[in-house]
Swiss-Prot record:
Annotated SUPFAM superfamilies: S-adenosyl-L-methionine-dependent methyltransferases (SSF53335)
Protein name (Swiss-Prot/TrEMBL): tRNA U34 carboxymethyltransferase
One of the record's GO molecular function terms: transferase activity, transferring alkyl or aryl (other than methyl) groups
Assembly description: Homotetramer.
Lineage: Bacteria, Pseudomonadati, Pseudomonadota, Gammaproteobacteria, Alteromonadales
Positions with a binding annotation for carboxy-S-adenosyl-L-methionine: 91, 105, 110, 130, 152-154, 181-182, 196, 200, 315
Gene: cmoB
Enzyme Commission number(s) of this protein: 2.5.1.-
Length: 330
């Protein structure tokens, strides 16, 4: 069974230590609930990932584990076969011992867009909410973060993350917990909190912003990326049914409306640092994710629209600061 003991040890003498009052019971329940099903099968695959520590580990400009010279071609093929069991791979790319995991998303492009606007991550304790398989977590570590914690309830994402971590070296200060943010107590401890590609999946977006705020220390930085539409501060799209074939998209605000939401949630220094239309080159089907992708979600006669007739995906990134506690919002 995947163990979280190294995480408990890591936070025992940190600003997160009070989390130990509740977290082991929550994760213990998760482990009991996943004794059967696909997780045990995936854990058998993880247990086969016995490879030497990589001769190189590049996290600053990419996520590259090993130079490709340590393994024979046969060993590389065996490793690739094991990693392919965890398909579909959505967020990346990763390079592992010469194997290029060409994921659905070019998540490195998003990182390059937002990185210049971040407060330095050096020595920071960072939370990535809805982290997927953890690609951006590794890039955060590459920027010098002291400890990176990701949360995502997906068992597949957890196993993909564990595979990469075992190949990179399990001593790395980076951990993924199979939790949703609603399972976190108000920790008031993280220097930086990321929420990228999550807000539009929340039935109550203001509550999500308040949950993010509750994880930050006072003066900590929120990095929020979500789908937006054009319009003024009163413009919000509520899809009637599906959006881009997704049935779990609830609210798409304009950038101006989202700024108001952040202000309502008692953030300050609110600024929109990037707005980008998702391109067919950034999100596409690959050999590692052979299912439908963005091109299948757009109107074939007009890629500025989804198949339902809504504006095509456009993503805005906001950065904001947690204000001093406001008793009216507690």
């Amino acid at each position: 069974m995947i163990s979280f003991s190294s995480f408990y040890k890591k936070i025992a003498d940190s600003s997160l230590q009070h989390w130990l009052e509740t977290l082991p019971a929550i994760l213990g329940q998760w482990q009991r609930e996943h004794k059967h099903g696909t997780l045990p099968k995936w854990e058998k695959v993880l247990n086969k990932l016995h490879y030497p520590n990589p001769d190189t580990l590049e996290l600053k400009d990419s996520v590259t584990i090993g130079s490709g010279q340590q393994l024979t071609s046969g060993e590389q093929q065996k490793l690739e076969n094991l990693l392919r069991i965890f398909q579909p791979w959505r967020k990346g790319p990763f390079s592992v011992h010469g194997i290029n995991i060409d994921t659905e998303w070019r998540s490195d492009w998003k990182w390059e867009r937002i990185l210049p606007h971040l407060s330095p991550l050096n020595n920071r304790t960072v939370l990535d909410v809805g982290c997927g398989s953890g690609y951006h977590m590794w890039r955060m570590l590459g920027e010098g973060a002291n400890h990176v914690v990701g949360i995502d309830p997906s068992t597949l994402f957890l196993c993909q993350f564990e595979a990469i971590k075992r190949l990179a070296g399990e001593e790395q200060p980076i951990h993924l917990l199979p939790l949703g943010i609603e399972e976190l107590p108000p920790l008031d401890a993280f220097d930086t909190v990321f929420s990228m590609g999550v807000l539009y999946h929340r039935r109550s977006p203001i509550d999500h912003l308040l949950q993010l705020r509750d994880q930050l220390r006072t003066g900590g930085e929120l990095v929020l990326e979500t789908l937006v539409i054009d319009g003024d501060e009163n413009t919000v799209l509520v899809p009637e049914d599906r959006y881009g074939k997704m049935n779990n998209v609830w609210f798409l605000p304009s950038a101006a409306a989202l700024a108001l939401w952040l202000k309502k949630a008692d953030f300050v220094d609110i600024r929109c640092v990037d707005i980008d239309v998702t391109s067919l080159a950034e999100q596409r089907s690959t050999d590692w994710m052979p299912n439908e992708s963005l091109v299948d979600y757009l109107d074939p006669s007009n890629i500025d629209l989804t198949v339902e007739g809504y504006p095509a995906p456009k993503r805005a990134t906001f950065i904001a600061t947690k204000n001093q506690p406001n008793k009216d919002l507690i």
